[in-house]
Amino acid sequence: ALARQGVDIIVAETGDGIMGEYGVQEILADPELRALGKAFLLCANDPVGVSGGVQEMKNVYGIQVDVVTGPATDNDVGVRFVAKATGLPGINARTKPRILAEHIQELLEERVPGFGSKRRNALKDEE
């Protein structure tokens, strides 16, 4: 219904349940819902969560995480770990929200035909 109203982006936050008991597994396992996803962020508390979360998403659900955020990226050591262990960017949403938003915007522009072409860019408007 939202797509028919011209919504460009829907952000779906699933909480801490990729391995928990919150019903997130059913959402991630649904091929129709998964196909709608154009960018996947993993929020991780620590290096173990980074490594395990990226592997779980790929091996169990066939989802390639695009960027890691969360407390694991609170410092340079964590950001370097993310890059070294996963090959993914680690971008802290609290300390670098603009960089994270720009990264996601670039991913969507690459993956969604016409994304952003008819809308003003709020990030550029702030400059």
Q: What residues fall within each predicted segment?
A:
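C-terminal helix of von Willebrand factor
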Residues: K96-R119
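Short acidic/histidine-rich motifs immediately flanking catalytic phosphotransfer sites
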Residues: G6
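Long, low-complexity, intrinsically disordered segments
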Residues: K118-E127
